[in-house]
Amino acid sequence: MVKQPSVKDVDQHEIVRYIAGFLKKSGKVKVPEWSDLVKLGITKELAPVDSDWYYVRTASVARRLYIRSPTGVGALRRVYGGNKRRGVTPNHFARASGSVIRKALQTLEAIKWVEKHPDGNGRILTKQGRKDLDRIASQMRQNTKITLEP
């Protein structure tokens, strides 16, 4: 019996793209109207260039919750943070925008992929979310096998 591939068995960049595509096609995810104006953190000068950045960030948060759960907004702010350029002084680490991450988590809660942890220690992936992510990973694995074979 062959084990179904999980999110951990596939390339992280590709699975995030596949999940983002799934979220966009499904129509369940509503992009906030402020998404074209916002910066993703204090470390950025401009808003994201990619018009689908909200789907990608939401997919990345879902993958992160699959890998390490429970996780809160503060931990995700550290994950998505970066170096703040301060001119001639040395760079300094700064966290990402908490509002963007919070809205992504609320979006995942609305489609029933994520729920709040009973102890209040962040959020966890639901059984439905885990099942959908595993299904996307197995479809991705099948598509790459088909294209790689001669």
Swiss-Prot record:
Gene name, Swiss-Prot/TrEMBL: RPS19S
Disulfide-linked positions: none
Any single GO CC term annotated in Swiss-Prot or TrEMBL for this entry: cytosolic small ribosomal subunit
Entry superkingdom: Eukaryota
GO biological process, one term: translation
Keyword line: Ribonucleoprotein, Ribosomal protein
Name of the featured protein: Small ribosomal subunit protein eS19S
Family to which the UniProt record says this protein belongs: Belongs to the eukaryotic ribosomal protein eS19 family.
InterPro entries: Ribosomal_eS19 (IPR001266), Ribosomal_eS19_CS (IPR018277), WH-like_DNA-bd_sf (IPR036388), WH_DNA-bd_sf (IPR036390)
GO molecular function, one term: structural constituent of ribosome
GTP-binding found in the keyword field: no
